[in-house]
Amino acid sequence: RMFFSVLFLSPVFFYKYRNDLDYFLDIRPVIVGFFLALHFFFWITAFEYTNVGNAVIFIALQPLFTYLLEYLFAKEDLRKGVLTGIMLALAGSLVISIGDLTMLMEKLWGDLLALTAAFFAACYLFRGRSLREEIEYFPYLYLVYTYAALFLGLFAFIQGVSFTGHGVYNYSCFLGLALGPTLIGHSSLNYSVRFLPATIVSLAILGEPILTTILAWVLLHEKITLTTFLGGLLILIGIYKASVNRQKTSSP
């Protein structure tokens, strides 16, 4: 996924920024890329030891981690209403996943991996916010994705994972993940974090199940369950409340 993303971005980067290769001398994007790589590593590994419902609950804690990082280290002026919005959105994620949720102790190791993935996702957005104020969008994107791909490649090599022989279908999925969730999804987050607190950006990620449900309803004619509807409603209310309180904070 990250390799193909870098592959797509490379021609543009080396054409437009071929005289600005000093970007590679900056150590800070290496750190952000490392955080992103750790997020993906722990997140994907978590599914080997726990189920989707448990993993979603713990990854949904990402906005809370981000809030704590901004509160403790960035002195971001976030009103209490933002925290209330986060808790509402977390409750919505819990409602959506309730049908696939098992006893946490049964899947403890996988749950801890998902929780760790949430923490590093928060670190990725938190550190990226300050860096985006100093580095142009496209070079930042390219550098972070490149370093993340290199670190993930190193992790795979250490684990003895082969880079070849996965079949046409799997490589097509990798391409799809690169074009959609990475180049559109993650890149949008990296653009937004330049203008919004990382907490608000990470909170918006919790809206993903809502979009997925709508697409499944439109394209696959899947029914929207009551728990999905109620959980989605809570998530939207939470995102709205956090955003409104953030705007009030920004007002003179």
Predicted regions, residues:
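Hydrophobic transmembrane alpha-helices of multi-pass small-molecule transport proteins
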Residues: 9, 13, 36, 78-100, ...
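Hydrophobic/aromatic residues within transmembrane alpha-helices
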Residues: 1, 46, 72-74, 131, ...
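Helix-helix packing/entry segments at the starts of transmembrane helices
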Residues: 55-61, 127-149, 182-218
